[in-house]
């Protein structure tokens, strides 16, 4: 998400010379992981929702309500001070109260998840009911914005007739300095170590792969951090995969890691738009992915630049990986096709859509 924001801000500031202010809530004095261009206003409201993580449910709920009131108060004061033309907010954050702030700006909401993401956990009981209620509340919320932006045509169809609904994908700002030649016996996966990314499913699929001695010299590298790290490492150890599966910390040199791999695998339960897939394919990696909602159908041409697998089919994911692992010529052919994804998602095309949206009816 931070890279997506950075790319958009950089274009608006460096190419169009717009005044841009980035407002955050939980920086705790930390610098952004990726440096923003000089001249960008960086303001942290010091709300710090994350300070309540790990607390008992009731304390966490009361803390959230208190911090939300503080968030609204401080953001309202800031907007009345700087008087922006446009307020572009990322769900969830401040989206619940931004439409009600009367500062004279046009309000834009970006959703970087699919419409179904509240339902992805398939929870039952009170938590399942809460998920359904939140989904219904979202349907009412998005109608309050001047523009509502989703990332894929598939997601837009699920939202239906929403006033101001626009589809703008993320741009392939990533510039590949090196390209994969498809010869390395290495598979890569990138993302947070949590439920959404589904790396537990990938590890199970890799266990199946490793039962075939023909692929005993292949390795899987997962790059990311998150609350599932300990659990995933335990899975790796219990399945005897510690010599062929590694959990790696995030790196700012991910392009180098892509270039030294032969395919990307995505095992997510859901996404808004898989930016990792775009970046890896820009480096020449064919993508093997579950057909989760949303994104893979928009990006992967099955059998051309990657392989799609029915979501949740662990055996199918293993088979798809082995199809590419066992055919270097096919990997190299798909690698060339994968690199063409940058044409569809070029920064010029995508940012042209954003500029049109921001400048309409000014």
Q: Can you annotate each of these PLM segments?
A:
Residues 73-77, 128-148:
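Membrane-proximal helix-turn-helix segments that form the acceptor-binding/catalytic region
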Residues 11, 16-62:
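N-terminal strand-loop element at the rim of the active site
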Residues 301-303, 307-314, 322-328, 343:
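Conserved acidic donor-binding segment of nucleotide-sugar-dependent glycosyltransferases
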Residues 250, 269:
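Aromatic "clamp/platform" in nucleotide-sugar-dependent glycosyltransferases that forms part
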Residues 154, 171:
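Carbohydrate-associated surface elements
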